[in-house]
Amino acid sequence: MPKRQDIKSILIIGAGPIVIGQACEFDYSGTQACKALKEEGYRVILVNSNPATIMTDPGLADATYVEPITPEVVAKIIAKERPDALLPTMGGQTALNTALSLRRMGVLDRYNVEMIGAKPEAIDKAEDRALFREAMAHIGLETPKSRLANATDIKDHDRKSHEAERSALKAKLSGDELDKALDELENQWNLGEGDRKQRYVNHAMAIAAQALDDVGLPAIIRPSFTLGGTGGGIAYNRSEFFEIVGSGLDASPTTEVLIEESVLGWKEYEMEVVRDKADNCIIICSIENIDPMGVHTGDSITVAPALTLTDKEYQIMRNASIAVLREIGVETGGSNVQFAVNPENGRLVVIEMNPRVSRSSALASKATGFPIAKIAAKLAVGYTLDELENDITGGATPASFEPSIDYVVTKIPRFAFEKFPGAEPTLTTAMKSVGEVMAIGRTFAESLQKALRGLETGLTGLDEIEVPDFDDNGDGRNAIRAALGTPTPDRLRMVAQALRLGMSEAEVHEACKIDPWFIAQFKAIVDMEARIREHGLPADAENLRMLKAMGFSDARLATLTGKRPKEVAELRNALNVRPVYKRIDTCAAEFASPTAYMYSTYETPFVGAARSEAQVSDRKKVVILGGGPNRIGQGIEFDYCCCHAAFALKDAGYEAIMINCNPETVSTDYDTSDRLYFEPLTAEDVIEIMRAEQENGTLHGVIVQFGGQTPLKLAEALEKNGIPILGTAPDAIDLAEDRDRFQKLLMKLDLNQPNNGIAYSVEQARLVAGEIGFPLVVRPSYVLGGRAMQIIHSESMLQSYLLDTVPGLVPEDIKQRYPNDKTGQINTLLGKNPLLFDSYLTNAIEVDVDCLCDGKDVFVSGIMEHIEEAGIHSGDSACSLPVHSLGTDMVDELERQTGALARALNVGGLMNVQFAIKDGTIYVLEVNPRASRTVPFVAKTIGAPIAKIAARVMAGEMLDEAIAAYGKKPNPRNLKHIAVKEAVFPFARFPGVDTLLGPEMRSTGEVIGLDTDYALAFAKSQLGAGVDLPRDGTVFVSVRDEDKERVLPAIRILSDIGFKVMATGGTARFLGEQGIVATKINKVLEGRPHVEDAIRNRQVQLVINTTDGNKAISDSKSLRRATLMQKVPYYTTMAGAEAAALAIKALKAGNLEVRPLQSYFET
C-alpha cells in the first residue's frame, strides 16, 4: 500500500521535559519520526517544550514550536498551522493525553485533523482500564482479578448539567451578550474544578472501599492515563490502601484507578510488536524482567531475548500479544504488551499494553537494531511492512523480516535516592529510576557484568554488599531473607551476597522469587569469584579469556586477587587476551550488515579463533565519548552535545565514532555517527576500542568534554595510554577543579572569589568552617550536579554533614580497607577528594555564562540571569537569556572576565562560568571548561549550533572559521526575543521529601519559554513545566523581614488584577501598613485553622514564601509539601514571585501567542 497522498502536513506532539517515566527515549523516537516523515515529503510541524532535545533543532521539522504541551496551547498551533494529521504516538503519555484532550475539546473536528498512528478508540481501549479488561475477556485472555474505582456517573451528570446551562443561554441570548455570558459560565465552571475533583475523588474512594472486600490484600493500585505508574503502588494493609488509592485518583486525569489482585512474585515479560494496516505483525523483541512482578518494569533489571521461556510458552505469548494488538485496533505502528506468568502453574495474564512507542520500544530498538519509531511513523502514513527496507542490513531484508539476535542484552536502571533524603529506597509499581544502562554480551554473565560496571556507581561487577542487621555470630539468615524480600536498587547484589554467605539457591529463590535459572547464573559468577580468590589469576590465555568471557572486568579481577587493575591489564595484553567486536544486524549474521553498530565480547566459538566484525576503516577519525546512563545532573543536555559533535565532525570530513551505553538516547541511534560502539564507559572498555580503531586509519583524537563528568574521569587514563585528547587540555580541566591552583589563577587575573577554604580531613573541615563562618556552602571536589552539596547554617548541621552525608560518598574499596572506622574512611576519601567550603552570598544574583574559545578568540554565546538567588544549583534555577535586570556595564564586565578566564585556561571548545553579583561586585563561583547543561538552551535561543561549532574548533579549526560554517555570527546581546529556562522536579515520586531547593541538583529536566515579552516567556516556561498559573483566587504570602519591601511589587500587581491576599501575622501587618488588605491566617505552629488547612481546602491558589534559618526552614516543610500535593504554584524568591505576578497578568490579558522557532531568526 503506497503512502497516503491526501495528507500534506503532519503535527507531531513531543514528550516535553524529561521526567521520571518519560526520558530521552522520546527524543530518540521523535527525531526518527521527524526524519522519516520529511524523507517522504510531508511538511512536519513539531511541538515540544524541551530545548535539550535533538528533535527541536530548527532543521529537523519544517515548523518547530518550543511551546508548552497543553491542550490549549496545542489548539492554538493547530489553528495557526492547519495540519492534515496528528501523530500522537511518539511523545509518550504526554502526547497521548494531549491528543485525547484535543479530541474531547472538539479541536480536531473543528480543524479537520485526522489522528494517525493510533486511532482515538484504540488509545481509549488500551489506556482505559475497564475497556481494556473487557477487550481482553473478548479474546479469551485473562487479566488479574480487578475492580475499577471512578466517578464516571457523577462526571457525566455534571457535564450534562453544564451543557444544559450553555444551551439555555444560547436559547435566551445572542451576540456580545451571549459571548459574555458563555465566558462567565466557563469561568465559573473552571473555578469549580477543584471542588468537582474532590467530589469525584470522594465518590471513587467509596467504590474503592467496596472493591477492597472483593480483591483483598495485598492489592495493586494502577491509575488510568498516567505515566510510569505515577500515583500507583502496592498496598499491604488498609491504611496503605486508602492512601495509595487517594494518590492514584489525584494523579489520574480521569479520576480512575484499577484495584487489582496481587500477582507479586510472578514472572514478568514484555513483547514489542509492530502491526500494519494489512495485518502483518512482527515481534521485534521479547523482554524478560529479572525482578518478579511488583516492581515497575522501568525499575526492573531486564534481559532480551526472554531467557526462561520454553519455545511453546514463547509461541503462546507471541500469539497472545498479536491478538491483543488486533483487538485493541493498533494497525499502524509499535506497541508493547506486558504479561505475568505464575511460575507455579504457568497461568498467563495480560497486565497492560502501550498503544504507542515507549521506553521498552527504545530498548528493543537498540537491542535489535530495528528502528521501531522510524518504521511506525511510515506505517502511520499508509505503508505496509513488506514495502519498507531494513536500514541495518542495507536493504537486504524488508522491515517485515522479524529480527533475530545471537547475543544477550541486559538493561539495569539507575536511581537517585541519594538526592532525596527521606525517600524510601524501595521499588514498587510506581517508577523511580532516573536513567538506565544497556550492555550486550554473548552470554548472560558477560552482558550482566558489563551492565553493572556501565552504571557508573562505582561497581566493577557483582560487587560485595553489606547485609543490613546481619549478625556474624548469630543466625543471620533472617536478616538476609528480609533484605532479599525487599525490592531495592541493590537487590541483585544482595542475591549474590546471600549466595556468598552460604544460602542455597532454593532458599534465595524462596525469599526473592527471582527465577531459579537467573539465580544459578549468579551462583556461577559467585563460585568463579571464590576460585579466583583462592587460586589467583590464571597464567594462561585460555583460562583468562574464559574469565573475561564471563564479564569480569580488569578492576574486578584486581579486587579479587589483591592486585591493581593495571597489573591485570598488563597480564592480559602479554597473553594477547583482547576482545573482538561483533555487529548488531537484526538477523543474527544471516546477512552482511554495512551498519557499524557494535559490541565487544571475549567469547570464542567452539572451533577456531574469535573473528572481529569491526572492519576498521582507513579514514581520519574522531571518537566521541557519551555520557552513559542518565542521572540527575547529567542527562539529555550532554547527549545533545555529543550528537552535535558527531554531526559536525561528519560535516568536516572526519569519521565520527560514538561510544555510549545509554539505550534511551539519540547518540546511540545507528545513524547518528559513522560508527557506534555500545559499550560501558570505563577506561578498560574505551582503551580497547581505541586500540582496535588505531589498527587502521588515523585517530585524530577523542572528545571527552561533551558527555559530562563521565568521560572527563577517563581523560587521565586515556592520556597515559597515548591517546590524543582534543580541545582543552586535561591539565586545564584539572586546574579549574583544583581549589588551590584555581585560586592562584583568579588572583593572577585579579578576579574575586567568595571567602573559601579546603579541608582534607574531618578535623580540618571543622577548622575551615570556623574561619569562614556560617552560613557557608560545602561540596566535594570533582562532582557533577552538586552531588552532596549543601548550605550549612550551624555547627550541628556541619557535624551531621560530615558524619551522615559524606560517608555516602565513600567508595566500596575504601570501606573494605577500613571496615569499622568511619573517620578513617572519610579522611582517606578527603585526602584525595577534599571538601570545598565557600562563604554563602545571601541575596546575590547568580549568572551563567557560556562561551566558545579557540585559545585566542572568544565568543560569549549566552549570559543567563538566574531568577533564583545564588545558592540554588544552576541546573535547578530558572534563568533568562538575555539578562533582564543587569545593566550594560555589568554585562560588559562579565564578558571581559569570561574572556580572561577562557584565554588563561587556553580553552579549546566550550566553557561555562558561574558568577554571583552582590552589591555591584562580581564573584567567580566556578569555571567548567567543558560542555554545560545550558548549551542546548543557548543554541535554541540565539539560533546558532554552538556544540557543532565547538566540535570543529576542538578538531583544529579557528573559531571564526567554525562559526562561518554554520552561517552568520549571531549577536546574543541584540535579540528581539527573550527565553526563560525552567527546571522540572520529581518530588511527587518521593513522598515525605522536602521540596526546598539548595546547591545539590534535584531536577530531572527542563523547558523553555520563548516570546518577545519577558512576562509571557516566563508564563510559557511555567506552563511547560506543569505549573498551572491561576488567573484568579487568593495568594498566600509569608516572607522573612528582609524580603517584606521586596515582595511589594508582586503583591501590588496581583492585588490590582483582582487577587485576594492571605498572610501570616507579621507579613499581614506590614502589607496593611502599605495599604494592601490581607486576611491574617495562622502559621502551622500557631494552631488551627492554619495555612496548610487553607491550602488543602483549596482556598489558596498561589503561595509566596521565604524562610530564614534552619528551624524556620524545617518548620515550613509541611507547607511546601501541601502545595506540591495540591498542585499550588509556590515561589521562594522575590524575583520569581514578581515574574509569576507579571506572567499571570499577561495571561489574564489573553496575550499568549504561539510562534515557530524558525520565525525568530528570519531576516
UniProtKB/Swiss-Prot annotation:
Q: Where does Mg(2+) 2 bind?
A: E352, N354
| Annotated spans, Oligomerization domain | 457-614
Q: Where is this region: Disordered?
A: 148-170
- Residues the record lists as binding ATP 1: R129, R222, G228, G229, E261, V263, E268, G294, V295, H296, Q338, E352
SMART domains hit by this protein: CPSase_L_D3, MGS
**What does the note accompanying the cofactor annotation read?**
Binds 4 Mg(2+) or Mn(2+) ions per subunit.
The positions annotated for binding Mn(2+) 1 are Q338, E352
Which positions does UniProt annotate for ATP 2 binding? R779, S839, L841, E846, G871, I872, H873, S874, Q914, E926
* Annotated Mg(2+) 1 binding sites: Q338, E352
Specify the protein name: Carbamoyl phosphate synthase large chain
Which species does the entry assign this protein to?
A: Rhizobium meliloti (strain 1021)
